[in-house]
């Protein structure tokens, strides 16, 4: 079971497929995810069951949470404004667990914020025991958004 990473009712958000678009900050690289633009502080929800593997600062992603699900897919939630204070590394989460809030953190040293509009950067990575690679989350987000809206009528 999966759900959309933001509430589908009561909050405005927008997103489109930007997988592979170039990124300039911190050197040339490609966009490994989907940006979901929303108001500052909009709740960010776990899309799946999994274990909190990482919480903290990353110079690119700012305040971020990483969750590994039972299919060994790593779900990356970045640019957060804050974390759920009850959450810690090693915790088991389920779809809908609040991880934090949408923000604009990142692109600099710890605490840097406001270099871009508030949004959730959502990424998905697969690991086969040797290498990890990113794949486009956009088709999954479209499906999960539709399912979440149907379930929450």
Regions flagged by a language model, labelled:
Residues 1-63, 95, 108, 135-139, ...:
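Surface-exposed, glycine-biased beta-strand/turn segments
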Residues 5-8, 28, 59, 86, ...:
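Extracellular/periplasmic catalytic domains that process cell-envelope and extracellular macromolecules
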Residues 39, 85, 126:
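Generic anion/oxyanion-binding catalytic loop in active/binding sites
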Residues 16-18, 70, 80, 125, ...:
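Generic beta-structure capping elements
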Residues 35-37, 44-46, 66-68, 75-78, ...:
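Structural recognition of the beta-strand scaffold that forms the well-ordered cores
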Residues 66, 91-152:
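Conserved, short, structured surface segments that act as functional micro-motifs
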Residues 46-89, 108-119:
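Zn2+-dependent peptidoglycan hydrolase active-site motif and core
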